[in-house]
Amino acid sequence: MRKKLNVYEMRIKVYLLENIPFQELQNALANFVDSALCQCEELISFHEENCYKFYSIGTLWPVERGMTYRKEQIYTLTVRTVDPDLARYFSEILRNHYTRKIKGLTVENRIIPRKMISE
């Protein structure tokens, strides 16, 4: 019997504390999520370990045409994982987490519906 694999999605509303050029965006988002991971002693070793993490970070939405995400604006960041414990942790910690450039406001959770692949 195969175990059902759920994909958990967190849509995080974030407020930018600084302008972020497109070239620096992924680094700023990774720093936001990684610094949240490092708030928990158990997850520090997980973060530092060289292995698959089983989560992914999207980019900010809506997309900015001017190649700079603007200070004092609210955007949506999408994080997905297959680990229910990690999803729970992200849901709790990212809602009020902040770095020098990004502040988390709210988190909306959902499980991505499974769809059969067709030809």
What do these predicted regions represent?
Residues 1-119:
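RNA-interacting cores
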